[in-house]
């Protein structure tokens, strides 16, 4: 059995920043994550995707952000339990005991759930032969941007991922078709402005009012994507690559058995300290929900700070926390 002050479930960007915040307050951390490496979706799904809303970084690749967060947390010697899930929860007096899928038991006074989307996988479009092209011509995630250099690409979707990747890949692709069933995209205003400018240049063609209909090709090599509008009109787009970005399936796994207040795959928390309905268990980042929640990495960072300052009194038996700025408290 391992003993620690704080158990963090999830080693994505918000979980990593929670390690730093706990360390600044003198609390030791163990961390559980289902992936083989730390970083969550930033590493597993889009390591090269540029992120624009991290303070002091006008633009930073997701993998580089994780590297910096890992360095920031490292002085506090977190213990990572990777490639395993949190399975069972028991309360023994003032302590929680969590058992992992590898039968490791971790005992702590506080649990911080920073599980992001939980266990995740892509929502795939219902195309008859799509599996034939997967990993050769059809990709749901991008972890090597350079492989799309000079390609003709269909990007399907209307959210941030579709818009941001269309903008990014327009720098290296030959031609991009951005296909969306509606005529409006759901993305940041600045991203929409950039998309409009690039579309006017001809590097991106907006194919709105259409949905994916079928694929044509041979031996895993895509030759064209057929799209269809509401009037049953079709267009053939001659492309090498299809990138469907229709979001992720979210599953919280065994967390649903922990008597937490869960609604629509999110954990309900109070909007001040982000504590769940179980005292001593907090939820932060994308997995947490409260009125007015913004799903931003930046928001998760703030939630990590507030929740761990509140957790200090639970770890140290009600002792008052004397607030100090990091400049006076910590010298690396």
UniProtKB/Swiss-Prot annotation:
Output the Gene3D superfamilies linked to this UniProt entry: FAD/NAD(P)-binding domain (3.50.50.60)
SUPFAM superfamilies in the cross-refs: FAD/NAD(P)-binding domain (SSF51905)
Q: Per its UniProt entry, which superkingdom is the organism in?
A: Bacteria
The alphabetized UniProt keywords are:
FAD, Flavoprotein, NADP, Oxidoreductase
What EC class is this? Answer: oxidoreductase
So where does FAD get bound? 33, 41, 46, 86, 120, 286, 327
- Name any cofactors this protein relies on: FAD
Free-text cofactor note = Binds 1 FAD per subunit.
Give one GO molecular function term. NADP binding
One Pfam family this chain carries? Pyr_redox_2
InterPro entries reported for this sequence:
FAD/NAD-bd_sf, FAD/NAD-binding_dom, Fd--NADP_Rdtase_type_2, Ferredoxin-NADP_redctase_2
Q: What is its EC number?
A: 1.18.1.2
As its record notes, the protein acts as a catalyst of: 2 reduced [2Fe-2S]-[ferredoxin] + NADP(+) + H(+) = 2 oxidized [2Fe-2S]-[ferredoxin] + NADPH
Assembly notes: Homodimer.
UniProt-listed PANTHER family: THIOREDOXIN REDUCTASE 1-RELATED-RELATED
Q: Which family does it belong to?
A: Belongs to the ferredoxin--NADP reductase type 2 family.
Q: Write down what this protein is called.
A: Ferredoxin--NADP reductase
Provenance organism:
Rickettsia bellii (strain OSU 85-389)
């Amino acid at each position: 059995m391992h003993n620690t002050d704080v158990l963090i479930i999830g080693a994505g960007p918000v979980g990593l920043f929670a390690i730093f915040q706990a360390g600044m307050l003198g609390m030791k951390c163990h961390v559980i994550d289902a992936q083989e490496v730390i970083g969550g979706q930033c590493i597993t799904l889009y390591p090269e995707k540029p992120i624009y809303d991290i303070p002091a970084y006008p633009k930073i690749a997701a993998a580089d952000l994780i590297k910096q967060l890992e360095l920031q947390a490292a002085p506090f010697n977190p213990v990572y339990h990777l490639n395993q899930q949190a399975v069972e929860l028991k309360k023994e007096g003032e302590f929680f005991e969590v058992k992992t899928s590898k039968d490791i038991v971790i005992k702590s006074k506080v649990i911080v759930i920073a599980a992001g989307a939980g266990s995740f996988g892509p929502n795939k479009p219902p195309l008859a032969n799509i599996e034939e092209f997967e990993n050769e011509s059809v990709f749901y995630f991008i972890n090597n941007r350079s492989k799309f250099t000079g390609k003709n690409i269909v990007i399907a979707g209307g959210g941030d991922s579709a818009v941001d990747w269309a903008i990014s890949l327009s720098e290296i692709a030959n031609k991009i078709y951005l296909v969306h069933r509606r005529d409006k995209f759901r993305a940041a205003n600045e991203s929409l402005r950039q998309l409009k400018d690039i579309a006017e240049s001809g590097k991106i063609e907006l194919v709105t009012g259409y949905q994916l209909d079928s694929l044509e090709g041979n031996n895993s090599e895509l030759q064209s994507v057929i799209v269809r509008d509401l009037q049953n009109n079709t267009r053939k787009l001659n492309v090498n690559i299809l990138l469907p970005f229709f979001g992720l399936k979210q599953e919280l796994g065994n967390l649903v058995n922990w008597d937490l207040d869960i609604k629509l795959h999110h954990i309900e928390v109070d909007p001040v300290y982000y504590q769940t309905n179980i005292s001593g268990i907090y939820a932060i980042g994308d997995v947490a929900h409260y009125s007015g929640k913004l799903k931003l990495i930046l928001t998760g960072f703030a939630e990590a700070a507030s929740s761990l300052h509140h957790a200090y009194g639970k770890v140290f038996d009600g002792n008052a926390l004397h607030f100090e700025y990091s400049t006076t408290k910590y010298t690396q």
